[in-house]
Regions:
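FAD-site-proximal beta/loop scaffold in flavoenzymes
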Residues: 36-110, 116
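Rossmann-like dinucleotide-binding cores of NAD(P)H-dependent redox enzymes
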Residues: 1-33, 92-100, 108-141
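Short acidic-glycine loop/turn motifs at beta-strand connectors
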Residues: 19-20, 66, 178-180
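Short, surface-exposed charged micro-motifs
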Residues: 15, 61, 75, 173-175
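Flexible, glycine-rich terminal cap/loop adjacent to redox cofactors
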Residues: 128-138, 143-241
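Hydrophobic alpha-helical segments, especially N-terminal targeting/anchoring helices
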Residues: 28, 64, 72, 99, ...
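Generic structural signal for residues in well-ordered beta-strands
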Residues: 7, 13, 70, 149-151
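A short alpha-helix-loop-beta-strand transition element characteristic
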Residues: 63-66, 113-121, 147-152
Length: 241
């Protein structure tokens, strides 16, 4: 907002037409409404697809879905008993750490163990300035499923470590179930967001509540105190806000 940037969510880009001033982007929103945007520069940063071309998959008899991803079962096995698939060529987020966990799970399954990947606790990090990280559900996803939830939010402006290094832009937001207090998701913008998200991932993996995080002693002064304060804020008990 400070930079005057506006976000138009859930808009599909239909076409981009160049002109002398830059370009015109034609879009359609989720309700079917069409809108054009006049732009100086267009940066295309999305649109990845699985690199399954050239693998001669058809000759092997491996089945693909409509998006050219390799079909697998819950154990990452394809329709052929001796072939497994993981990572960017199957469904799910195209993230290196997601693929790594899937590879470990496959090895465990082949060895007769019970390999498993919890896709609800796979973090995503955007390495910008400020850094952005997220895990679990978004507010939009919870609303779509009619899940009653609480929000805890804490600004880095009130975090001593962030203030000390003059990097206090951003916040930590935690979403918790309104009835059980179970942590459902989190979103962070600010210093070391990609590192701080791990604590919330561990909490979610163990089915922790926001109070579990809030009652865990965090060293002072650290960035992680913002996570604790956000957890306290879920029940409106933040200390330094």
């Amino acid at each position: 907002k400070k930079q005057g940037i506006k976000f138009h969510m859930q808009h599909k880009v239909e076409k981009i037409k160049k002109n002398n001033e830059g370009a015109v982007i034609s879009t359609t929103d989720k309700d079917g409404n069409k809108k054009d945007f006049d732009c100086d520069v267009v940066l295309i940063s999305v649109g990845r697809k699985p690199n399954t071309n050239g693998l001669n998959i058809e000759a092997a008899g491996i089945e693909l879905d409509a998006k050219q991803r390799i079909k697998t079962d819950k154990n990452f096995k394809t329709n052929l008993n001796n072939i497994y698939a993981i990572g960017d060529v199957i469904t799910g987020p195209m993230l290196a750490h997601k693929a790594e966990d899937e590879g470990i799970a496959v090895a465990e399954n082949i060895a007769g163990q019970s390999g498993h990947v919890n896709y609800d606790t796979i973090p995503g990090v955007i390495y910008t300035t400020p850094e952005v990280a997220s895990i679990g559900k978004t507010e939009e996803q919870l609303k779509e499923k009619n899940v009653d939830y609480k929000i805890g939010k804490f600004s880095f402006m009130a975090n001593s470590r962030a203030k000390a290094i003059d990097d206090a832009e951003g916040f930590v937001k935690i979403l918790a179930d309104a009835k059980t207090d179970k942590v459902l998701g989190a979103h962070l913008i600010g210093p070391h967001a990609g590192e701080l998200i791990a604590e919330i991932g561990v909490a979610m993996e163990f089915g922790a509540s926001s109070e579990d995080i809030a009652r865990t002693c965090h060293a002072h002064p650290t960035f992680s105190e913002a996570v604790k304060e956000a957890a306290l804020s879920v029940d409106k008990r933040a200390i330094h806000s």
